[in-house]
């Protein structure tokens, strides 16, 4: 399953790492997952497990093996990471393994374009520099 927000609300539900402390929310979300779900609305990469755990990529050496357990994977964001790392974030799925990857890009160029766009607030570009 691939969604932007969550399996329960595919377009716009936020699921943050700290939501693992809200067991009711996690249980309800996982009720919609058959096995694996990939999402990214919060732009914070990591793996959510059905037993209310969240693993940031660095906690799992940037790899996670898929098995019979239901998981929800936040792939992060190519253009607007929000985990404090300004590099682009994505995942590679190969066989039964997910690998989190980061690549450098020049957020300063994107920030300048956002600042030049009258309909956008400057903070949208400024936060790219810090990955927030």
Where are these regions (language model features)?
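Conserved catalytic scaffold of divalent metal-dependent phosphoesterases
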Residues: 1-38, 42-53
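Acidic, His/Gly-rich catalytic cores of divalent-metal-dependent hydrolytic chemistry
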Residues: 50-132
């Amino acid at each position: 399953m691939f969604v932007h927000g969550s399996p329960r609300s595919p377009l716009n539900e936020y699921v943050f790492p700290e939501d693992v402390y809200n067991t009711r929310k996690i249980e309800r979300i996982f009720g919609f997952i058959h096995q694996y779900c990939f999402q990214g609305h919060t732009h914070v990469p990591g793996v959510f497990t059905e037993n209310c755990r969240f693993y940031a990529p660095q906690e799992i050496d940037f790899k996670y093996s898929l098995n019979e357990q239901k998981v929800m994977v936040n792939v992060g964001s190519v253009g607007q990471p929000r985990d404090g790392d300004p590099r682009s974030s994505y995942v590679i799925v190969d066989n039964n393994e997910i690998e989190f990857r980061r690549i450098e890009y020049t957020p300063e160029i994107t920030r300048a374009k956002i600042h030049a766009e009258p309909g956008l607030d400057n903070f949208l570009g400024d936060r790219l520099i810090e990955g927030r």
